[in-house]
């Protein structure tokens, strides 16, 4: 392709510095991560990385605004911004299965999001994705290790949005504390490390994950 042709990837987790490390003209390349379903979900992460031409990042942000998308500027780290929130939300949910069912966990999660983690995992066939992305994040620490159950379960037995399983108050409190703990832990880390701005993080969570 021409040296001035823009090249982007829709990867959700691999840093641009790894994807494009052998590209001759690195300045015209970056990651633009869409969220499913892309025809409906407006959020797009636009990744700023060391080799990207700032004018390219600015142009892509303008282009997405002009086409009805919402660009969210993110630094070039493992899993960027929103996958760090979503993947670890799902991973923590799986670690809760020693004390609650998938339906109970999704019911409590429904107080905060439209659909619980297990319903979304079924929809996206996301179990292998969590294994891959959290294994990748283990470069930052053992605490990101994916729950082993993701390797042995194909489909979760859960409840759809708007439906609820019976959950006793003690169990509901434990689920709530763990899920919110994951959400706040990742959010604070993202802002503290300047992976993204607090405003883009909040907007992205509402649009892409809410």
What positions do the PLM features span?
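N-terminal glycine-rich phosphate-binding loop for ADP-containing cofactors
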Residues: 1-210
